[in-house]
């Protein structure tokens, strides 16, 4: 425990809060170009082929981001919008790609949670 005199001389050091999505550099979203689109397997106990893309952002960062929803039209050189948000069972994946923006289309025939997947409202019959 420091003395009052030591605190007057030095002061308390404020703990720096580490960002959970450093590549965003305090932006809500970032644009980037896909350098590789592939599938990967999650950690135990889950089992699947998760769709991910390696993206080079406009600020020069190279990140791995998750492609949510069923089916996608991404390939190399696709321009995408990236937001923060990790995928718990994929180590190293700390970003999501925004559906229905730039080159990535929304999920087809999506009825519920449409805004999260960039799907338009279906025509009423």
Swiss-Prot record:
<feature type="region of interest" description="Disordered">
    <location>
        <begin position="105"/>
        <end position="125"/>
    </location>
</feature>
<feature type="compositionally biased region" description="Basic residues">
    <location>
        <begin position="113"/>
        <end position="125"/>
    </location>
</feature>
<keyword id="KW-0694">RNA-binding</keyword>
<feature type="modified residue" description="3-methylthioaspartic acid">
    <location>
        <position position="89"/>
    </location>
</feature>
<comment type="subunit">
    <text>Part of the 30S ribosomal subunit. Contacts proteins S8 and S17. May interact with IF1 in the 30S initiation complex.</text>
</comment>
<keyword id="KW-0689">Ribosomal protein</keyword>
<dbReference type="InterPro" id="IPR006032">
    <property type="entry name" value="Ribosomal_uS12"/>
</dbReference>
<protein>
    <recommendedName>
        <fullName>Small ribosomal subunit protein uS12</fullName>
    </recommendedName>
</protein>
<dbReference type="Pfam" id="PF00164">
    <property type="entry name" value="Ribosom_S12_S23"/>
</dbReference>
<dbReference type="InterPro" id="IPR012340">
    <property type="entry name" value="NA-bd_OB-fold"/>
</dbReference>
<keyword id="KW-0820">tRNA-binding</keyword>
<dbReference type="InterPro" id="IPR005679">
    <property type="entry name" value="Ribosomal_uS12_bac"/>
</dbReference>
<dbReference type="GO" id="GO:0003735">
    <property type="term" value="F:structural constituent of ribosome"/>
</dbReference>
<keyword id="KW-0699">rRNA-binding</keyword>
<comment type="similarity">
    <text>Belongs to the universal ribosomal protein uS12 family.</text>
</comment>
<comment type="function">
    <text>With S4 and S5 plays an important role in translational accuracy.</text>
</comment>
<keyword id="KW-0488">Methylation</keyword>
<keyword id="KW-0687">Ribonucleoprotein</keyword>
<dbReference type="GO" id="GO:0015935">
    <property type="term" value="C:small ribosomal subunit"/>
</dbReference>
<dbReference type="GO" id="GO:0006412">
    <property type="term" value="P:translation"/>
</dbReference>
<dbReference type="GO" id="GO:0019843">
    <property type="term" value="F:rRNA binding"/>
</dbReference>
<dbReference type="GO" id="GO:0000049">
    <property type="term" value="F:tRNA binding"/>
</dbReference>
<feature type="region of interest" description="Disordered">
    <location>
        <begin position="9"/>
        <end position="31"/>
    </location>
</feature>
<comment type="function">
    <text>Interacts with and stabilizes bases of the 16S rRNA that are involved in tRNA selection in the A site and with the mRNA backbone. Located at the interface of the 30S and 50S subunits, it traverses the body of the 30S subunit contacting proteins on the other side and probably holding the rRNA structure together. The combined cluster of proteins S8, S12 and S17 appears to hold together the shoulder and platform of the 30S subunit.</text>
</comment>
């Amino acid at each position: 425990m420091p003395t009052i005199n030591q605190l007057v001389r030095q002061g308390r050091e404020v703990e720096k809060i580490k960002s959970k999505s450093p590549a965003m550099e305090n932006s809500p979203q970032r644009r980037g170009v896909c350098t590789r689109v592939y599938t990967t397997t999650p950690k135990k106990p889950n089992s699947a082929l998760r769709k991910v893309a390696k993206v080079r952002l406009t600020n020069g960062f190279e990140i791995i981001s998750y492609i949510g929803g069923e089916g996608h039209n991404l390939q190399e050189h696709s321009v995408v919008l990236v937001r923060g948000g990790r995928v718990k069972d994929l180590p190293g994946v700390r970003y999501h790609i925004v559906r229905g923006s730039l080159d990535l289309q929304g999920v087809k025939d999506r009825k519920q949670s449409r805004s999260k997947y960039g799907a338009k409202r279906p025509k009423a019959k």
